[in-house]
Amino acid sequence: MPHIVLTNVSDFNSFYNKFKKEVLIIKNEKDQTNTIIRFEEIFSNQLKNIILIKTIVIENTNQPQTYYIMAMKKNNQITIRLDPLTDPKNKTDAVKISLANIAKQYKKIDPAISIGKTNLEQYLL
């Protein structure tokens, strides 16, 4: 399962508080195709240790995939992964890019955050 672990996290909820709806459009000139990644809504649990981000991905005019990205806080770490209940069947490049984008947004908010364990290195560059 694709995941990213962020370490040295001091303020988990800053992302929740600063979240804005966003649409990423990735153009592939070679194939002349577009990929759309849309971050729609964000939810937090009562304990404020889990955040869910509703995400929609459309690739090459295929059926859209709707799923939630889960960010879980444990100690000074955050694990970013796909929510198991809405896990998309096709873990395409766009799905993996959406996870990496959330990690990049956390790093933008807090530059002291480091990337720990991940199987998405190529999407974090």
Annotate each language-model stretch with its function.
Residues 2-7, 12-77, 81-125:
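Ser/Thr-rich, low-complexity intrinsically disordered terminal regions
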